[in-house]
Amino acid sequence: SPGMGRHGETGSVFARLGVPVLQAMVTYLSQEKWEQSFEGMDSMSVGSSVFEPELDGQIITTVIGCTEKQQGEHGSVSRTVPLPAQIDLVAGLAVSWGRLQVKSASEKKVAILLHNMPPRRDMLGCAYGLDAPESACRMIRSLQEKGLFLQRSWENGAELLRELLNGLTNENDTLSYTLMREKSAGVLAGRDYEQWFTGFPEHTRKEMEERWGQAPGEWLVLDQQILIPGIQNGNLFVGIQPARETEQEAEAACHSLKRPCPHQYLGYYKWIRDVFHADIIYHVGAHGTVEWLPGKALGLSADCYPELCLRELPNVYPYIVNLPGEGTQAKRRAAAVLIGHMPPPMKQAGLYGALEELSVLLEQYRNAEKYDKKQLAILEEELQKKAEALEIPKEARVSLDGLEGWLEEIRHSQIRDGLHILGKIPVGTRMEHILEFLSTGGETREVLKERLQEIPKELDAVCATFEGRFVPPGGSGCPSRDSREVLPTGRNFYGLHPGQI
């Protein structure tokens, strides 16, 4: 067997081959039902087509075939019908990953995006539990050592962030049009965007035009040219993920699978693909917005917004290991290879562990909503019991959305012992704090310390993807609850085991 996510125990053939493995899917839905479906996959196929391949570290792509019933001589017969456009998409992605293995390192082009949600200057480089600018700087240094061509370097993350802020950003109210144009890292011609846009399905064009006007819109557009915030440095582009909505609407739109993004959002990714010609893109930290754009929940079609953005571009995502529900969203809707990174230790480790148990139950409930509704009543009862035991306010327990909102607020309000830096082993008092944080997971301090010495694997995985190599799978969750499953970090983490749903 490929390993079922436990390659260290069984010996995964994927790990031995060392190449990325793409999982394409066939659904029992007819083509008509699939095209109209929000779920994108039938519930019978999800386990074998999504959950199990994730355990093996496969890249989850999309549906390439549907099932049609036909009347034959002996009654109804099911036949798999290929979807040519979808097959082309997966084949193109396979070629892109393969190209990373054979292309000279000095010729490869890399895009690294920092998040910016809400789209204010003070939120540039935000990432849950991660020092994203410093981590990006360490990624760049590691890739340069592997051969990435740069014209100059940054001493640290603060210097990188300062240069980004001195350029064009998603918040430019005080800049003149002349300065906006001068500070833009590049432009996408409006006519090129419009020509591309006319090929979108009618309903997609209509919903975008109703919200953002006719292509190419007005958001970060000057003289019919879409502006591109970021920095070009040799074969590297360090960008700022585009704003999905106005600052006032950003929070409400963040997790919406219904709200269309601005024209500039799609144009920004098109520029990365077709003008800058990136060979690979890295989204730094939890979490971005591309995986939450409108479209199917699984098995996306070529006109779902995440596919419109990324197309055949390899997508890699350093992501905090204790947010598996949101991380797997990027795996399933943006074909992402996740690189799990350590969370920063919490001062209130005991409470944090209880909150993580609640978070796991919420994730199980959300999965059951999509794939196994028979479990909902049992999980809802468990959720209410856990919420009552934690003395969560009644108003937060009225709905699951309220409970998730309360949990997110508490997470952000807890005192962290500094942000994690990708690939950096904690030392001194930081090491002591993190060992204390992990000590509730059942391992000895000696074993934990040994596993923490493997944190540099987070950067090793970044370099592996740059070279088109396989990133081994691993578990996710709070390391203080189950360090054996979660550590070491630097693996392509999966969410819940199917048996937990």
What would you call each of these model-derived segments?
Residues 1-501:
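Ligand/cofactor-recognition surfaces for anionic moieties
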